[in-house]
Each structure stands twice: as C-alpha cells, then as structure tokens.
C-alpha cells in the first residue's frame, strides 16, 4: 500500500545487527486514524521495526515518511508507549505526564486534562510506587499523548497487566484513538488483542519473502469472541506456523 496521503510510510531495505540481518525489504504504510497491529514470532524484527518507525533508530537502509515528509529523527508528532511504564519514581504522576515540557500553567492544565481522560485524575499527585500496574500504564498512555502526537507506537503495552485490566486498557486505547483520529501501530504477541483492536493485522517475517502478510478483521462494531473472528484467528495461526515453523 503506497499512497501519498499516508500518515506514516516506511520502507526498510535492510536492518542489520553486525552480520545478522533482521529486516529486509519491509514496506508498511499507515493511514491517518488507522489502528494496525504488528505480530510475529520472537526475533522476527517487530521491536526493531518499531524503533525505526519512531525515529529512534537511524542505522538502517531505507526511508520513512511522516505525512509525506522524510523523517530524520525523533518527531513530536510520534508518541511511543513501552511495555513497561518507565515512570520517574521521584516525580508525581502529573509531573511524569508533563515531563517533556516547561511545566508551566499550560502544561499542568494539559496534564490534568489527560489524566482525567485516562481516569487518573484522583492519582495526579501520587508517586508511581502508589499506583497499580494498570494505573501506571494509564499514566504512560497520558504521557504518550502529551505532545499531541498524530501517530502512536506501542510495544506490547498491556502484556504485564492482568486480563481484566488489559481489556480496560484496550478499550481506553480505542476510545482515545477514535477521539483524536490517531494512527496507531501496536506490537503484540496476543492474536485476540490484535483481532479486537485492529483495522489491519500485519504478520512480520523480517527476512522472509514476502516480509509481511496482511489480514483484515471484519468492520466495526465487533466484540471479543465474535464468531467472525474465529476463522480469521485460525488463518493467522496457520500462517504463523507456515512462516515461522512454530
């Protein structure tokens, strides 16, 4: 998919770590407002791809375009949420959210609004050690939204929380993405999560041919466990076995 109006357009000709090639001829384009999940076996290059997409990793051959313009490094239009919340333990939740700012009145107001949006207004003055795992990840989501990004990258953000909290965070992500028309690229090992959240699912085989295989869940609205998703899940698992011999 190569269109001029893509929010994020990536072509990675090659990414190497020493003598080992982890990505070769991988091309993925994301439309504005689209939620895309990136799946694949461990070691297939998902995290490397996400690091390149964020602008953090420039040591590769290829090209990234953000809203049609070359991306040459970290950009405030791209937010990043990690598997672990990575909150500064000596700062309050509100200060963590507004960390990358002058912490002036406008920043504090925005921090308060974002914490309200993710349901943490009562914990604004708490320290990270006082939060549950789910609350800490909510704070990380608020921090990821602080710069008003148009693209949000997430690296297995819900894998460290319990199943009930995971579902609530998934619904929060969908709500925020719709309200802000965010483009979302989510790395996950959870096929059910990908099926529930995504407009498209991309199975990555970093050095394979083809390097990507695309799946499209049925249109929304759809719920967890919908019968229509079962056949697609089976197809994805079959393809995973074929690609990665797992």
Regions picked out by a protein language model, each given a short descriptive name:
Residues 3-181, 185-192, 197, 203:
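ABC family nucleotide-binding domain
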Residues 87, 220-221, 242:
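Active-site/binding-pocket entry motifs
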Residues 160-163, 231-246:
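Extended, non-globular alpha-helical segments
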Residues 183, 208, 243-246:
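Short, polar/charged, Gly/Pro-enriched helix-capping and turn/loop motifs at alpha-helix termini
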Residues 207-235:
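Conserved beta-strand-loop-alpha-helix hinge in the C-terminal portion
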